[in-house]
């Protein structure tokens, strides 16, 4: 699930993804790609 948060590295996606109720995500194409909680 993509989140429109600009990122350079995956660490920048930690808080935005958690705030969205998901797990830590990866940085893909300059935006955070969050992993849904399973």
From Swiss-Prot:
Keywords: Disulfide bond, Ion channel impairing toxin, Neurotoxin, Potassium channel impairing toxin, Secreted, Toxin, Voltage-gated potassium channel impairing toxin
Subcellular location: Secreted
CC per GO annotation: extracellular region
Molecular function via GO: ion channel inhibitor activity; potassium channel regulator activity; toxin activity
Disulfide links within the chain: 7-27, 13-32, 17-34
Lineage: superkingdom: Eukaryota
Chief site of localization: secreted
Tissue specificity remark: Expressed by the venom gland.
Description of its domains: Has the structural arrangement of an alpha-helix connected to antiparallel beta-sheets by disulfide bonds (CS-alpha/beta).
Functional note: Blocks voltage-gated potassium (Kv) channel and augments neurite extension via NGF/TrkA signaling pathway.
Recorded family membership: Belongs to the short scorpion toxin superfamily. Potassium channel inhibitor family. Alpha-KTx 03 subfamily.
Protein name per the record: Toxin BmK NSPK
